[in-house]
Each structure stands twice: as structure tokens, then as C-alpha cells.
Amino acid sequence: INYPFLSAPVEKTDAWGSRTYDILKLLTADEKAGIQMVQTFEYFRSKQEDPSWMDTVDKFERITENLPSDYVECFSFMTQVIEMPIYLSWLMERFKGLGGKMEKVIVTNFSEISDDFSVIINCTGLSSGELCDDSEVYPVRGQIIRIKPLIGEMHLDQQVPTLAYIVPRSNDMILGGVAQQG
């Protein structure tokens, strides 16, 4: 999903999410990119205010009838699913095709190399906080399993810490959950 989860400040993350949504929607036209639009249902156990990102997704609607037990409301909308192994390979090919070069180095802080490169792409994951001297970056633990594809839409219950989700992909489905900070 393109909207930020457990992130802040909302003004910035919503703007990033909106721009990302628009770009990824365009990229769905290229089947090799590994991105598809999917109908998404996010379920809640209590009434919700309008989400700050509702105007940035397609076909947003609020559902209050015919919901699974224990749920009183659901947001329905279109968003993208990115199959990361496919997408990252596609991005790397584009990068190389545009003349980009990869250089593998061991870095303990970005300040060590900031003068050597005009652009540094930080995709270090859990090491981000350490490399960027940002003490507010922390890991969030999750668990997933992959199964044969059964449905074509995404289902979410993102109420921390009992997070649960079903994400369809081209050859499998991801079943996941848990959101334990630290």
C-alpha cells in the first residue's frame, strides 16, 4: 500500500504517499515492472475519521454493511501492489540503461562518502538510522507466509499490534501480521 504506516510527520508522509501513488499508477502500464492495481479493503473495529490520504487513492469509499464479525467499518479503495524482486530488477535495468553505475563499498556513515557522489540512494533498511545519524529510525517486526493465490484483492487490518494483511501477487499471496516496534 502506498500510504505510510507507523510514520510521521503526516504532512510529509502523505505528500510522499500521494506522489508515489501517482508514479506507481503510471508504472502499472509496464508489465515488466511488477506493479499491479488491486482493490483493497481495510477493516476497522471502531468508527474512523476520514483518512488524510483518502483523496490520493482511486475509488475510495466507506463500507458499513456486510462486514466480517467484530468489524464496524471498512475503507475500500484502489492501490498498487509491488512485487519487490521483480520491481527492483526492473529498476536496476533502467538505472544501468541510463548509464548508472554501481559501486560496492563498506560504509559506516554517509558522511564518509558524501563528497564522492552527486547522488546517494539510501536503501539500507534497518541500518538507515545508524548511517544517517537518525536516532528516530527503528525497526518494526513483522511475520509473513506465502501461499498459492486464492483471491485478487487485498485485505488489511492495520490496528497495531494485531496487524494482519492479505496481499495478492502474480504467483502467490502474502499473509502477514504483527507490528512490534523495536
Can you name each region flagged by the protein language model?
Residues 1-17:
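Conserved N-terminal glycine-rich FAD pyrophosphate-binding loop of Rossmann-like flavoproteins
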Residues 19-98:
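Flavin (FAD/FMN) cofactor-binding and adjacent substrate-gating region
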Residues 79-82, 107-108, 125-128, 180:
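Short acidic/polar capping segments at secondary-structure boundaries
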Residues 115-125:
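Short hydrophobic core segments
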